[in-house]
């Protein structure tokens, strides 16, 4: 057992209040692509460009094909040992003592049996749908129907055939190659009429994915509840930063607020700064590698075996 793990496991049982901050790195261990690097393309479109209100306004059929593909992938994926470790941890504490803040929209945390009272999906869920009409407040939670309409059924065929078309290419400078299996350029995007897309059963306007797109605000009610958890007494003893760098808002703000109140930070990620790994950052532990494998080991004093 290395020094950092020993110190962390000695501190963990003393904690009265814990936050787990979860990013895309944990879901990557379940086989889901991230929006970054060589996994950032879908049909030669930058995924980030499709995850915007403007993209949906310009071509809702294109955006719905992308999200139908993501929904199908998330349904095929299974929670990994990291998800189950956090699930067990959530049942060791009350919801005023422990929360998981996930930036993922794949639903894997909830499917792992996590205590829903202590789970905050701040970027929404692929399996929530909401009406686009300003005058309508219809929301459909936990809709796992796939495909949502007949026009979107081809996404299943594409996902199931990725392995047969997998190859990579890179540029002459040796930069990361692009995995064509995540960018199926040989199947051009279909043009889908709005009448063939998911529609609101109340007002018959278009439905959209219930996720927070780039440029949109995070849900105020969730952020308010999280802020209350962070600021209330007793102070947070520990924040687990899992599968994310924790350097982007609001993740970075939670880390810094915990530090300011005397709490400690434990990072589980494939990319961690050397000064953290070497124990040179005060009150911070770094565990480099696959968070799905590291979490069950690190949390064992509280959760036992997975």
From Swiss-Prot:
| Taxonomic superkingdom | Eukaryota
Reactions the enzyme catalyzes: N(6)-malonyl-L-lysyl-[protein] + NAD(+) + H2O = 2''-O-malonyl-ADP-D-ribose + nicotinamide + L-lysyl-[protein]; N(6)-succinyl-L-lysyl-[protein] + NAD(+) + H2O = 2''-O-succinyl-ADP-D-ribose + nicotinamide + L-lysyl-[protein]; N(6)-glutaryl-L-lysyl-[protein] + NAD(+) + H2O = 2''-O-glutaryl-ADP-D-ribose + nicotinamide + L-lysyl-[protein]
EC number(s): the record gives 2.3.1.-
Q: Name one GO molecular function term.
A: NAD+ binding
What the entry lists under Gene3D superfamilies is as follows: SIR2/SIRT2 'Small Domain, TPP-binding domain
Instruction: Give all residue intervals belonging to the Deacetylase sirtuin-type domain.
Output: 1-305
Q: Which UniProt keywords apply?
A: Metal-binding, Mitochondrion, NAD, Transferase, Zinc
Q: Which residues form the active site?
A: 123 (proton acceptor)
* Cofactor names: Zn(2+)
Residues where substrate binds: 67, 70
Cofactor annotation comment: Binds 1 zinc ion per subunit.
Binding locations of NAD(+): 23-42, 103-106, 243-245, 269-271, 291
Q: Where in the cell is it found?
A: Mitochondrion
Q: Which residues bind Zn(2+)?
A: 131, 136, 200, 203
Instruction: Give all cystine bridges in this chain.
Output: none
Choose one Gene Ontology CC annotation of this protein and give it.
Answer: cytosol
Which EC class is the enzyme in?
A: transferase
Q: Which family does the entry's similarity section mention?
A: Belongs to the sirtuin family. Class III subfamily.
Question: How does the record comment on the protein's domains?
Answer: In contrast to class I sirtuins, class III sirtuins have only weak deacetylase activity. Difference in substrate specificity is probably due to a larger hydrophobic pocket with 2 residues (Tyr-67 and Arg-70) that bind to malonylated and succinylated substrates and define the specificity.
Q: What PANTHER family does UniProt report for this protein, alphabetically?
A: NAD-DEPENDENT PROTEIN DEACYLASE SIRTUIN-5, MITOCHONDRIAL-RELATED (PTHR11085:SF10)
Its biological function? NAD-dependent lysine demalonylase, desuccinylase and deglutarylase that specifically removes malonyl, succinyl and glutaryl groups on target proteins. Has weak NAD-dependent protein deacetylase activity; however this activity may not be physiologically relevant in vivo.
* Note from the entry: This protein may be expected to contain an N-terminal transit peptide but none has been predicted.
Name under which the protein is recorded: NAD-dependent protein deacylase
Species annotation: Candida albicans (strain SC5314 / ATCC MYA-2876)
């Amino acid at each position: 057992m290395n020094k950092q793990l020993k110190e962390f496991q000695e501190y963990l049982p003393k904690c009265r209040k814990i936050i787990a901050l979860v990013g895309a790195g944990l879901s990557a261990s379940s086989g889901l692509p991230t929006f970054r690097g060589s996994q950032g393309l879908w049909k030669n479109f930058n995924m980030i460009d499709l995850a915007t209100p403007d993209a949906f306004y310009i071509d809702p059929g294109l955006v719905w094909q992308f999200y139908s593909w993501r929904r199908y992938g998330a349904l095929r994926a299974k929670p990994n040992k990291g998800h189950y470790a956090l699930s067990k941890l959530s049942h060791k504490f009350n919801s005023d003592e422990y929360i998981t803040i996930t930036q993922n929209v794949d639903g894997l945390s909830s499917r792992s049996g996590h205590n829903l009272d202590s789970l905050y999906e701040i970027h929404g869920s692929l399996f929530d749908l909401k009406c686009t009409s300003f005058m309508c407040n219809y929301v459909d939670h936990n809709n796992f129907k796939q495909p949502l309409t007949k026009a979107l059924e081809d996404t299943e065929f594409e996902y199931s055939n990725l392995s047969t078309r997998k190859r990579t290419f890179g540029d002459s400078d040796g930069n990361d190659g692009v995995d064509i299996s995540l960018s199926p350029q040989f199947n051009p995007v279909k043009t889908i009429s709005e009448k063939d897309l998911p529609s609101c059963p109340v007002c018959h306007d278009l439905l959209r994915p219930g996720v927070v797109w780039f440029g949109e605000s995070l849900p105020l009610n969730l952020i308010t509840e999280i802020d209350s958890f962070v600021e209330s007494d007793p102070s947070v003893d520990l924040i687990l930063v899992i599968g994310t760098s924790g350097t982007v808002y609001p993740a970075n703000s939670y880390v810094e607020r915990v530090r300011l109140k005397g709490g400690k930070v434990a990072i589980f990620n494939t990319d961690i700064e050397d000064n953290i790994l070497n124990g040179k950052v005060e009150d911070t532990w770094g565990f480099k590698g696959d968070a799905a494998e590291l979490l069950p080991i690190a949390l064992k004093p509280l959760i036992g075996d997975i």
